Amino acid sequence: MNRREFLQIGGAFGARVLFGSSLFALGCDLSLYGPLQAPDENGIRLPKGFRSRVLARQGEPVAETAFVWPLAPDGGAVFRDDHGWIYVANSEAVPGGVSALRFDPSGGVVDAYSICAGTRRNCAGGATPWGTWLSCEEVPDGRVFECDPQGVAAAVARPALGLFQHEAVATDPVGRQLYLTEDRPDGRLYRFTPNRWERLDAGVLEVARVDAAGFVTWEALTNPTPGPRDTPTRLQVPASRAFNGGEGIVWSAGKIFFATKGDDRVYELDLATSLLRIRYAAATDPIAQLRGVDNVAVSPRGDLVVAEDGGNMELVFVTREGLGLAFLRVEGQPFSELAGPAFDPSGQRLYFSSQRGPDGRGLTYEVRGPFQALRRHALRDDGAA
C-alpha cells in the first residue's frame, strides 16, 4: 500500500494524524471517492461505484464504423452535439491529426471520423467557447490548427498563434484572450489577443514576464512566426520567464492553470490580479507525489484533474491546498502515458486515453460513475511562484 492509498482509506482522520494540526485546523475531508479497488477487466483501478469501458483501440475499427482509430491518442475534449456529444482526440504521431467519436444521448458510439490530417505530433490543445478544437503540433516549428468537431469544415492552420513547440492552449472567454504553453525545458507561457473575437487569423502574441513577487506582465514578440534561422519565440524577450516543460493548460473561473513536467508543478494564474502561484509541486506534496504531470482538465464541479505521463499511470485530482489525490490508476502499462481527460456534458462520464496501452497500441476509455458525489474540501490558496 502506498501513501496515497493509505490516505484514501484512512480518510480525514488519518490525514490529520499523519500531517498534524495544520490540516486539523482546516477541517479538511481529504478522501475522494474511497480507496481504489482491484483492477477491473480493463486493468483500471477505480473507486467503488465506478466502471470503465474501452471505446477505441489503435489500429482497429471503432464500434460499428469502418474508421480505424489512429496511433498515440493524446489531448482531447468534449463538445455538445445536436443529438448527443463528441469527444475529439489528437494523435501524437507523424503523420498526426485529430479523430472524433460521436455519441448518442444514451452514450453509445454512433460514428467515428477524422477532423484533421497531415499534421505532425498533435499533442494537446484546447476547446474554444465558439465550439472548435485547437490542436497543437509539438515540433520546433509547430502550428496550431483550428478544427471542426463535426468534421464538416476543414482544419485551418493559425500561424498568428506562433510557430514554436506547442503543447496546449486555453481560451479566456471573459478577457477574450488565449494562453499557450511550450513543451521545452526553457519553454515560455504566451498570450494571444485576436484582433476580432472568434477569429484567430490575426492578433498580438505576447510572452510572460514574472517579477520576484509573482506578478505577471506581458511583452509582445517581435516575430511570432520565426523561420529556421530566426530567433525563436522563447528567446525574443530576454526577460521572459522560462518554464520547465509546459504541458496542459485550462481556464476556469477567471484563472488559468497549467502544468510543467520538468519540475512536476501545476501553476495558477489569477487573471484579475495577474498573480502567479504554485497550486501543486511534487517537491512539497507530503502525500501523493504526483509525478509526470501532463494534460490538465477541470471537472463540472470545478475540480482540477491532472493526467500522469508515466508515474503511477494515474488521473489525479489536485486540491487548492496543493494535495494530489488519485482518482484512478491504470495497471500493466508501464511504458504509456495517460492523456485527454474530459467530461461529457452531464458530468457523469470521463473520457481519456492511454497513449501506448499494454502492447504499444493506444486505447481510449470511458469511466462512468457518481462524480457528483464528491465531497468538497475546505481549501486554501498559498504558495508564491
Model-derived features with residue positions:
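N-terminal secretory signal peptides
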Residues: 1-5
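Sequence/structural signature of beta-propeller domains
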Residues: 6-19, 23-385
